[in-house]
A protein has these predicted regions:
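N-terminal secretory signal peptides that target proteins for export/translocation
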Residues: 1-10
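Generic short amphipathic/hydrophobic targeting helices enriched at N-termini
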Residues: 6, 16-17, 37
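Cyclophilin-like peptidyl-prolyl cis-trans isomerases
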Residues: 23-215
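Secretory targeting signatures
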Residues: 10-28
Length: 215
C-alpha cells in the first residue's frame, strides 16, 4: 500500500499525509479501534427509505453549488444517513476543515477539526467490512470519512478531487458529483493547509450554507 502512486502532481509531503489519512479520514470522538472487527452500530429506529437515486445540492458560501447524485442501491444506509442529516439541517453552517488538492476535500464535522460527528454511527458499506459496494473513488466521488474502526462513520464526508482508487474497498463511496466539479476544483486550488494533513485554519474553512435533497 505504501508504494502506490497517487498522482503526478502530489508533493512528497502530501504523499505521506495521504497515507496518514487512510487511517484518519475522520477522527471521530469515540475511541478508535483496530480495523477488521465489526463494532456495535448506533442506527436509526426507522428503516432505510432511500433505495434508489436521490440528489443533493451542496451550497458552499462564496463558491457555488455542488450537485451530487447519491446511489441508494449501492450504499443504502450511508445514503439514508446523509439524507437524514441534510434534511434535519445538521450540515447547515458546517465547514470543509481538511482539503488536499489532488486528493479530496473533507467536511461535515460540527467541531470543525475532524473530531466530531452526529449522535449516530453507521455500518461501513465497503468490501473490507463484508459489504459489496462497487462505487469507485474516482474524481467526483462522495464518500464517508471514518476513524480506524470500520463502523465509525457518522457525519463527516469527503469529495474526491482526483482519482483515489486506493480507497476502494475500505471507505463507503455513495455517489458522484454531477454538476459543480469546478467548485471542487476552485476550493482545492484556493486551500492553504496548515500542515501535511490538509488542515485548514478555522477562519479559512469553506462554509456549507445548506444541503438540499431532491428525491
Amino acid at each position: 500500500m505504501c508504494e502506490k502512486e497517487y498522482g503526478k502532481t502530489m508533493r512528497k509531503g502530501t504523499f505521506v499525509a495521504m497515507l496518514v489519512v487512510l487511517c484518519m479520514l475522520c477522527g471521530c470522538t469515540q475511541k478508535q479501534e483496530t480495523g477488521g472487527e465489526k463494532e456495535t452500530v448506533q442506527q436509526n429506529d426507522q428503516q432505510t427509505s432511500v433505495a434508489g437515486t436521490v440528489y443533493a445540492d451542496i451550497v458552499i458560501e462564496d463558491y457555488g453549488t455542488i450537485t451530487v447524485e447519491l446511489d441508494g442501491a449501492a450504499a443504502p444506509e450511508t445514503v439514508e444517513n446523509f439524507v437524514r442529516l441534510a434534511e434535519d439541517g445538521f450540515y447547515d453552517g458546517l465547514t470543509f476543515h481538511r482539503i488536499m488538492a489532488g486528493f479530496m476535500m473533507q467536511g461535515g464535522d460540527p467541531n470543525g477539526n475532524g473530531t466530531g460527528g452526529s449522535d449516530q454511527t453507521i455500518t461501513g458499506e465497503f468490501a473490507a467490512n463484508g459489504i459489496e459496494n462497487n462505487l469507485s473513488h474516482t474524481r467526483g466521488a462522495i464518500s464517508m470519512a471514518r476513524a480506524q474502526a470500520y463502523n465509525s462513520a457518522s457525519s463527516q464526508f469527503f469529495i474526491v478531487h482526483e482519482d483515489s482508487t486506493f480507497l476502494d474497498g475500505n471507505y463507503a463511496a455513495f455517489g458522484y458529483v454531477t454538476e459543480g466539479m469546478e467548485v471542487v476544483d476552485n476550493i482545492c486550488e484556493d486551500a492553504e493547509p496548515t500542515d501535511n494533513n490538509g488542515s485548514i485554519a478555522k477562519e479559512a474553512q469553506p462554509v456549507i450554507q445548506t444541503i438540499t435533497i431532491r428525491k
